[in-house]
Amino acid sequence: MWWRVLSLLAWFPLQEASLTNHTETITVEEGQTLTLKCVTSLRKNSSLQWLTPSGFTIFLNEYPALKNSKYQLLHHSANQLSITVPNVTLQDEGVYKCLHYSDSVSTKEVKVIVLATPFKPILEASVIRKQNGEEHVVLMCSTMRSKPPPQITWLLGNSMEVSGGTLHEFETDGKKCNTTSTLIIHTYGKNSTVDCIIRHRGLQGRKLVAPFRFEDLVTDEETASDALERNSLSSQDPQQPTSTVSVTEDSSTSEIDKEEKEQTTQDPDLTTEANPQYLGLARKKSGILLLTLVSFLIFILFIIVQLFIMKLRKAHVIWKKENEVSEHTLESYRSRSNNEETSSEEKNGQSSHPMRCMNYITKLYSEAKTKRKENVQHSKLEEKHIQVPESIV
């Protein structure tokens, strides 16, 4: 029993002296300075180390481990290591770790969340007119490059706040997004107003507001109608009046209206309709058209490259055949010339040898004939010489 009590008494101070394993969350806006603090109660024979979310060492005690000057040492002592990261970006998000080395190794994790506040909203209005004479106003409120996605609502006549059809489009990195909210107004009064309100965590309770007054839209429509009427009277050619505020003629039937699914809110001055598919459908069509065009161009380019490669291969085969034929012809010509020279030399050698033999035989025959004549003449002279003395006697 006493042994257990003593063990517990020795264990509690060690736990208080060491760095507790826990996770802390820090939220910071993009462009601000991030401060990371690591504090322990131990003061002797201990070391502190900060690690990036990717696992690289930032500082080991007061010694920097990275050449990146983005991380700066704020304070170092035996029981504290604090660093700063100025001008924070979305790439600095993640879980940073502080390691405390003493008799054992303990870890403190700091989860850093970087917020990107939305830009000032842009509000656009357009009038759509159908063949049956009905018309409605489409309001689009958009903001760009925010993280996380903002919340967009519509304030009708300073009394009622509703939500429209919201579309979020994330950028290629998957972090920031562009948000658009669409609201369709079927009926409105001249003094009616609509405000686009944007809320976001990075705004810290503040709101971004883009107001719209329908009296400006009515004034623009009346001005455009008067100008068109004057032009029609002067040219004696009646025309239908159009609005300069993005007026669109819609030739579709009421079946399209049945396919639209919105939230409907009625007011004494306003009847609203939220269309979450209006902007998405148009962008989807344009995206499909662009993708089809790019695919067709890539296919044409692929065919051209294949034809060029085939032409190069054909030319290479023809050149190779011609080269082989020329080499074969040259070798045959060389072998033929060598054979002719060899045969001519053999013929010359064979014809000269009999001639030499004939000349030698002729020479021997002539010499033998000459000697024979000389012997005959000599024998005749001897016979004459012998016969003369006998006659004298």
UniProtKB/Swiss-Prot annotation:
Residues 18-287 are extracellular. One of its GO terms (molecular function) is identical protein binding. Residues 1-17 form the signal peptide. Residues 18-114 form the Ig-like V-type domain. Residues 231-241 have a biased composition (Polar residues). The chain crosses the membrane at residues 288-308. The keyword Methyltransferase does not apply. PROSITE patterns: IG_LIKE. Residues 225-273, 328-354, 374-393 are annotated as: Disordered. Disulfide bonds join 38-98, 141-196. Residues 118-210 form the Ig-like C2-type domain. Coiled coil: none annotated. Residues 309-393 are cytoplasmic. Changing residue 57 to A: Reduced binding to CADM1. Severely impairs interaction with CADM1. Keywords: Adaptive immunity, Cell adhesion, Cell membrane, Disulfide bond, Glycoprotein, Immunity, Immunoglobulin domain, Membrane, Repeat, Signal, Transmembrane, Transmembrane helix. Changing residue 101 to A: Reduced binding to CADM1. Severely impairs interaction with CADM1. CDD domains: IgV_1_Necl_like (cd05717). Residues 242-254 have a biased composition (Low complexity). Residues 255-264, 328-348, 374-387 have a biased composition (Basic and acidic residues). GO terms for cellular component: immunological synapse; plasma membrane. Mediates heterophilic cell-cell adhesion which regulates the activation, differentiation and tissue retention of various T-cell subsets. Interaction with CADM1 promotes natural killer (NK) cell cytotoxicity and IFNG/interferon-gamma secretion by CD8+ T-cells in vitro as well as NK cell-mediated rejection of tumors expressing CADM1 in vivo. Regulates CD8+ T-cell proliferation in response to T-cell receptor (TCR) activation. Appears to be dispensable for CD8+ T-cell-mediated cytotoxicity. This is Cytotoxic and regulatory T-cell molecule. It comes from Homo sapiens (Human). The lineage of its organism: Eukaryota, Metazoa, Chordata, Craniata, Vertebrata. The gene is CRTAM.
